[in-house]
Amino acid sequence: MKARKGQSSWRFYKNAWIFLEESKENLLSEEEAKSILKEKGLMVRNTYDFDTKDNTSFWFIIKDKLEDISELPASTRTKIRKALKIYNIRRIELDELESVAYEIISSAEKTYKIKESSTSSLDYVSLFERFRERDNCECWCVENKTNGEIVGFSINYVKADSCDYDYIKCKDEAIHNSSYPFYGLFYTMNQYYLGEKKLKYVCDGSRSVTEHSNIQPFLEHNFKFRKAYCKLKIHYKWWLGVVVKLFFPFR
């Protein structure tokens, strides 16, 4: 995911330009979109009117209120406490994380409901190179207190008043052995960014098409994340726009 020159809030991802400051994004004019697409890419994903009261077809999953642990569901509280007895949730440098993350990613990908191509060793190197290119990345890990094994991690992108939980993985066996690593990880990060750092909100991304990991419903149910609705306009490269109109004339 690379930044657009001169526009640090834009990132290029899978042939599309995406604005990372979702709460500050405005509706682009056709000329502005064309200017962005002159560089490269097939489309610009333009979201605007962030956190509108209208229930639109697109949203971001955010948490903007930090409640006491007693306000979370009883089962969630139990799992958080068990996770924190088993695991040390701590900050970790990107270089240290890179040395252990490949095994975690490979294990996590086996559990996805919708199978995508697995992350190869070359993809892995490229992935961490992209993270190094980004400013304000912070990494967290889930470390077993007994043997020191790192079973999960999160790579976050910290912005002026919010934080994106950008890339999160956990070993399949740790998820299914009743040690609840995700519960400890999300609880600790929420406490840090919303409580200690006083950010306005944390975000786990936008509407998922594949929902291969069920992470967004998990966060809504267990940690009181919510949908921040917004409006969406896709600006296409001119020739792709023609194709889209031919095949989907009423959209």
Briefly describe each language-model feature range:
Residues 1-12, 47-52, 62-176, 193:
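A conserved beta-strand-loop-helix scaffold within acyl/acetyltransferase catalytic domains
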Residues 1-27, 34-43, 48-86, 201, ...:
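Terminal substrate-recognition subdomain of acyl/acetyltransferases
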Residues 26-34, 121-127, 182-188:
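Well-ordered, non-membrane alpha-helical segments in soluble/globular domains
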Residues 105-108, 126-133, 181, 217-218, ...:
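Short alpha-helical interface elements
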Residues 136-242:
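Aromatic (often tryptophan-rich) hydrophobic motifs at membrane interfaces
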